[in-house]
Design a protein with these regions (language model features):
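Signature of dsDNA virion morphogenesis modules
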Residues: 1-171, 175-176
């Protein structure tokens, strides 16, 4: 989309993350979320970033094989209010910036004309549908609980496989999840 985010700008932007709404436009005909919409006022608020978002930079390998660094935080999803909110985990995510807060300039970087942000604040974190590509390849809502369950399942499969392939060898594996 022609945007260039420096680490200095990212650090400033993250400070505006608390209380940012989780926004979405749900299309009941297609049973999925859509895009940003024609106007930013479309859709519903499906959640919020808490005051203390537990923010961290994390590396994730995207489906294209490239490892990228993403900003991750806790969010509260209003799943009891809206049935469709239960399908948010796994959906792509895009950030929306508050237009009057945006400052920056167009610059050529590596032969490409890009908008380099210097100031902005969050307006929302937008839930995207299956057919909508996010600005940042692997940006998505995920559940730590689901990730942890997957890790435990993988460890259990490893143990079963190990027991089958090495009846004579005994190995003790201790896990500590914290």
């Amino acid at each position: 989309n022609g945007a260039y985010v420096t680490s200095e700008f990212a650090d400033k932007l993250i400070k505006t993350l608390p209380y940012t709404p989780i926004k979405g436009i749900y299309d009941s005909f297609n049973d999925d979320f859509s895009d940003h919409g024609a106007r930013r006022a479309e859709g519903r608020i499906y959640g919020i970033v808490p005051e203390n978002p537990n923010f961290a930079w994390e590396e994730h390998q995207d489906s294209d094989g490239v490892t990228r660094t993403y900003g991750c935080s806790d969010v509260l999803i209003f799943s009891a209010l809206y049935e469709e909110a239960n399908s948010i985990v796994g959906k792509a995510q895009s950030m929306e910036l508050y237009t009057p807060s945006i400052k920056g300039s167009w610059q050529f970087i590596n032969g490409k004309r890009l908008y380099v942000y210097t100031e902005a604040c969050f307006l929302g974190l937008q839930i995207l549908g299956e057919d909508v590509e996010p600005c940042f390849e692997g940006a998505a809502f995920f559940s730590f609980c689901d990730s942890l369950k997957g890790l435990v399942e993988n460890m259990e499969r490893f143990n079963l496989q190990f027991e089958k392939t090495s009846e004579e060898t005994q190995m003790i594996v201790n896990y500590k999840l914290s």
